[in-house]
Design a protein with these regions (language model features):
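Negatively charged, low-complexity tracts enriched in Asp/Glu with abundant Ser/Thr
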Residues: 2-56
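Intrinsic-disorder-associated interaction segments
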Residues: 9-13, 17, 90, 94, ...
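Short runs of predominantly hydrophobic/aromatic residues within well-ordered alpha helices
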Residues: 17, 72-76, 110
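Acidic, low-complexity, intrinsically disordered interaction modules
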Residues: 43-73, 77-105
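Charged interaction scaffolds used for protein-protein
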Residues: 101, 110-113
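Short alpha-helical scaffolding segments that buttress acidic/His motifs in well-ordered protein cores
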Residues: 114-121
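Low-complexity intrinsically disordered segments
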Residues: 124, 128-133
Length: 133
């Protein structure tokens, strides 16, 4: 299901935001010690572990190196997957949660707190610490 289809399941954007917030808090509380990006050395993925790019001299190109624990995505990736998001074309996106939601018609003031949670997670905080906003 595309993210737009997940959002459309709710009666309003406000309801979607409310459910997303509740589900992020639930996931962060249930997995409070989980550190998605240990050592602040990688970037966020909505569909897998944290990663970084490293130059491979043999290939003369950058390759993606996994730097986080095996999982199905960052806190927002996992939350939105739990809400039904499974579109393989959309999920590899590496942008911020703010950009994802702005691209779906949400307003900055509604999603500012989500960006703070994602920034905390991406800076090496445990999910329990990341949601304390």
């Amino acid at each position: 299901m595309k993210l737009s289809e997940v959002i459309a399941k709710y009666s309003s954007q406000d309801e979607f935001i409310s459910v997303l917030k509740s589900e992020v808090i639930k996931l962060g509380t249930e997995n409070s010690d989980f550190i998605y990006n240990p050592g602040f050395i990688g970037s966020c993925s909505y569909s897998g572990p944290a990663y970084r790019f490293e130059f491979d001299d043999e290939l003369c190109d950058y390759v993606q190196i996994v730097v986080g624990p095996e999982c199905k995505g960052c806190i927002f990736g996992q939350t939105m997957q739990n809400m039904g998001w499974d579109n393989e074309e959309e999920m590899p996106y590496f942008g911020s949660i703010s950009t994802v939601l702005l691209n779906h018609g949400f307003h900055d003031k509604e999603i500012r707190v989500f960006q703070e949670v994602q920034s905390n997670q991406d800076s090496g905080a445990s999910w329990g610490e990341a949601i304390k906003q």
